[in-house]
């Protein structure tokens, strides 16, 4: 993998949206010249959903498992899309310069605000116009027409905040850690509705997040291993056995 001087930015949500928005990202390659390998985007397994705008340029998603090579099969996506949770890594490619803007949403928050079936979005990228009502489509238009990314962040927060305040569960957890979030979802699933059996709770988790509790636990463990490894690298003492034990792998 090669790197470039392209602009990449990350915004964390305000505290009132912490249990709804995972983060906001922008990628802008309009001012740099990238070679073929640098125009591939490698996205990891993700429990989140995403609102994705291609403000300039295009994106083509490679077939699952295809290597980042010119002959690999690929398909273009719309300029404005909803990405569901992904259970596998995803590779995409930009034919030329691009400017993309992405809002990562917790899947249960998206379901509460829109009524969408998150499970039906698993491993899918869908044009926004096919799934959202007029209010949400108006947001997509406003974000696309904004002057800069800071304005886009402000538009998204102003749109989401009243909707999340109205629809959020009373026990939604203000945490950016996947382990904390998945435990909060499991607790709400176990105490919601008339039926409180284990099977019914698991069905609610799948309905709200698109994934099983076991998968969410595994993603949380992977995230913790990443943070443990990053801290160990910063401290100059990486001991993989200790990292595995601290992350629940040993």
Regions found by a protein language model. Give the residues of each.
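Residues within the DNA-recognition helix of helix-turn-helix
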Residues: 204
């Amino acid at each position: 993998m090669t790197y470039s001087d392209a602009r990449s930015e990350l915004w964390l949500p305000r505290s009132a949206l912490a249990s709804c928005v995972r983060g906001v990202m922008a990628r802008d390659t309009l001012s740099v010249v990238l070679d073929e390998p640098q125009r591939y985007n490698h996205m990891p397994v993700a429990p989140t959903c995403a609102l994705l705008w291609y403000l300039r340029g295009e994106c083509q998603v490679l077939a699952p498992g295809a290597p980042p090579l010119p002959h690999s099969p690929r398909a273009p996506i719309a300029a404005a899309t909803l990405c569901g949770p992904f259970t596998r890594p995803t590779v995409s490619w930009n034919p030329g310069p691009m400017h993309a803007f992405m809002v990562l949403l917790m899947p249960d928050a998206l379901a509460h605000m829109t009524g969408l079936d998150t499970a039906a979005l698993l491993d899918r990228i869908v044009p926004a116009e096919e799934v959202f009502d007029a209010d949400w489509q108006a947001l997509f238009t406003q974000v696309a027409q904004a002057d800069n990314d800071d304005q886009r962040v402000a538009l998204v927060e102003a749109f989401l905040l009243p909707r999340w305040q109205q629809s959020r569960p009373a026990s939604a957890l203000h945490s950016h850690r996947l382990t904390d979030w998945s435990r909060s979802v499991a607790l709400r699933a176990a105490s919601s509705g008339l039926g409180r059996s284990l099977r019914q709770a698991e069905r609610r988790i799948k309905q709200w997040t698109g994934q099983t509790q076991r998968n969410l636990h595994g993603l949380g463990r992977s995230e913790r291993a990443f943070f443990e490894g990053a801290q160990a690298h910063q401290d100059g003492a990486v001991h993989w056995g200790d990292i595995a034990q601290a992350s629940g792998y040993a």
